[in-house]
From Swiss-Prot:
Family: Belongs to the globin family.
Ranges of residues in domain Globin: 2-142
Name listed for the protein in its UniProt record: Hemoglobin subunit alpha-2
Chain positions recorded as O2 binding sites: H59
Keywords: Heme, Iron, Metal-binding, Oxygen transport, Transport
Binding positions for heme b per the UniProt entry: H88
GO biological process, one term: hydrogen peroxide catabolic process
Gene that encodes the chain: HBA2
GO MF annotation, one: peroxidase activity
Length: 142
């Protein structure tokens, strides 16, 4: 999915507002995903998935850091995310549909925390961006 210059600006601006809360938002999105889509828990059998667990917070920070990296390298995501793509495809073997589910939960989390900034245009741009990240992460599945 091609991001327009306006999409890139919207994504960078929106993610910039996330700032220091990125890890918290990542953890909240994971919790939403686990509650809304319980089958996603199967990839985390060794985690304490209770609200506020250190493991969920830690993984939420990893998710947020990966997205921060993707935002910083929005014009070269395939190269910037290659190691993460390899990890999810070859080692973790995550079902690609889970990236869509997490993306949806991230959008809900961002909208809940930044309702005034979450305009239809920003929503569309973030959705396209997360779809692009998902495409990159699933590119090594072939």
């Amino acid at each position: 999915m091609v991001l327009s210059p306006a999409d890139k600006t919207n994504v960078k601006t929106a993610w910039g507002k996330v700032g220091a809360h990125a890890g918290d938002y990542g953890a909240e999105a994971l919790e939403r995903m686990f509650l809304s889509f319980p089958t996603t828990k199967t990839y985390f059998p060794h985690f304490d998935l209770s609200h506020g667990s250190a493991q969920v917070k830690g993984h939420g920070k990893k998710v947020a850091d990966a997205l921060t990296n993707a935002v910083a390298h929005v014009d070269d995501m395939p190269n910037a995310q290659t190691a993460l793509s390899d990890l999810h495809a070859h080692k973790l073997r995550v079902d690609p549909v889970n990236f869509k589910l997490l993306s949806h939960c991230l959008l809900v989390t961002l909208a809940a925390h930044h309702p005034a900034e979450f305009t239809p245009a920003v929503h569309a741009s973030l959705d396209k961006f997360l779809a692009s990240v998902s495409t990159v992460l699933t590119s090594k599945y072939r």
